[in-house]
Amino acid sequence: MLVWLAEHLVTFYSGFNVFSYLTFRAIVSLLTALFISLWMGPRMIARLQEMSFGQVVRNDGPESHFSKRGTPTMGGIMILTSITVSVLLWAYPSNPYVWCVLFVLVGYGIVGFVDDYRKVVRKDTKGLIARWKYFWQSAIALVVAFVMYMIGKDTPATELVVPFFKDVMPQLGLLYLLLAYFVIVGTSNAVNLTDGLDGLAIMPTVFVAAGFALVAWATGNVKFAEYLHIPYLRHAGELVIVCTAIVGAGLGFLWFNTYPAQVFMGDVGSLALGGALGTIAVLLRQEFLLVIMGGVFVVETLSVILQVGSFKLRGQRIFRMAPIHHHYELKGWPEPRVIVRFWIISLMLVLIGLATLKVR
């Protein structure tokens, strides 16, 4: 919005030309989302407390979590608001990639909101019925996957980028739809599973978004894309604005979500953020990179799959409790230790992922 306005005002004052610079807009996008999140935090927490929108804790969970019962949840609303406002202010409104991410962010946010509402108002720990949650996640993912396919059909935008191999970029064709679907839905649920401790999910999300901001900048730059042997995508640059908005909103939310948390993001936040990261990865053609940089989300999800599979097949559990962060809690690790160590691992994985762009 402000970019469009600046383009019309630059004829009156050349200083408005600064709004055309991607680096400038990336910085102010981050700061805008950060300040909105910090401003909304105390007000939203107070409002959620007034409405008794408190966290519902499962009776079969770790005993240390019983003290979290009643902590305000659905704080993801302020994350989504911060991201959306910042992106609308600083990104080019004509960019289709930006709208694809916002569509998933808001759509999955609505699904998460309904899920949270059932939990906190109806006191139903299961929330939205699983099949309906999956149905709406799938519908949203398929719609945006089809739109993305039509935008980039028969171009590098539908090629598969394989790490370590600079000349291996097969054209996916209609398989693009299937891959996009699984990446978006899978990442959404993976972040949701990770969101079980104070600040555990939001910081890896910030790290991954920051990593993708660098990738988006390189992908949207002809020279750097050629240098790194990745597809040049002319719309990709504006995803930097989306990624930095996620970073800013995430850091602002962490101010209130750090241990001991004053507010939880709820499914309205975790499903939306995961869906947004998955969509960004697909748009940048970096699905494999997401697996590396988002390794914490992958391991959390695999721990649940292995736990359920082992119990059904052998009648035995592999972990004391899944997702795996609960396993370490039950081993006696203090919650802050689990959180910070997962953060460190996440940061390392993002750096490793970025390094793979050059190791080809």
From Swiss-Prot:
Species for this entry: Erwinia tasmaniensis (strain DSM 17950 / CFBP 7177 / CIP 109463 / NCPPB 4357 / Et1/99)
EC number: 2.7.8.13
Cofactors demanded by this protein: Mg(2+)
Pathway in which this enzyme or protein is active: Cell wall biogenesis; peptidoglycan biosynthesis
Primary location class: membrane
Gene label: mraY
Known function: Catalyzes the initial step of the lipid cycle reactions in the biosynthesis of the cell wall peptidoglycan: transfers peptidoglycan precursor phospho-MurNAc-pentapeptide from UDP-MurNAc-pentapeptide onto the lipid carrier undecaprenyl phosphate, yielding undecaprenyl-pyrophosphoryl-MurNAc-pentapeptide, known as lipid I.
Lineage: Bacteria, Pseudomonadati, Pseudomonadota, Gammaproteobacteria, Enterobacterales
Keywords annotated in UniProt: Cell cycle, Cell division, Cell inner membrane, Cell membrane, Cell shape, Cell wall biogenesis/degradation, Magnesium, Membrane, Metal-binding, Peptidoglycan synthesis, Transferase, Transmembrane, Transmembrane helix
Enzyme class per UniProt: transferase
Gene Ontology process terms (BP): cell division; cell wall organization; peptidoglycan biosynthetic process; regulation of cell shape
CDD domains xrefs: GT_MraY
Matching InterPro entries: Glycosyl_transferase_4, PNAcMuramoyl-5peptid_Trfase, PNAcMuramoyl-5peptid_Trfase_CS
Highest taxon, organism lineage: Bacteria
GO CC annotations, alphabetized: plasma membrane
Catalysis performed (reactions): UDP-N-acetyl-alpha-D-muramoyl-L-alanyl-gamma-D-glutamyl-meso-2,6-diaminopimeloyl-D-alanyl-D-alanine + di-trans,octa-cis-undecaprenyl phosphate = di-trans,octa-cis-undecaprenyl diphospho-N-acetyl-alpha-D-muramoyl-L-alanyl-D-glutamyl-meso-2,6-diaminopimeloyl-D-alanyl-D-alanine + UMP
Gene Ontology MF terms: metal ion binding; phospho-N-acetylmuramoyl-pentapeptide-transferase activity; UDP-N-acetylmuramoyl-L-alanyl-D-glutamyl-meso-2,6-diaminopimelyl-D-alanyl-D-alanine:undecaprenyl-phosphate transferase activity
HAMAP family, alphabetized: MraY
Transmembrane regions listed in the UniProt entry: 26-46, 72-92, 94-114, 132-152, 168-188, 199-219, 236-256, 263-283, 288-308, 338-358
Protein topology in the membrane: Multi-pass membrane protein
UniProt entry tagged with the keyword Transmembrane helix: yes
UniProt record similarity statement: Belongs to the glycosyltransferase 4 family. MraY subfamily.
The protein's name: Phospho-N-acetylmuramoyl-pentapeptide-transferase
Location(s), subcellular: Cell inner membrane
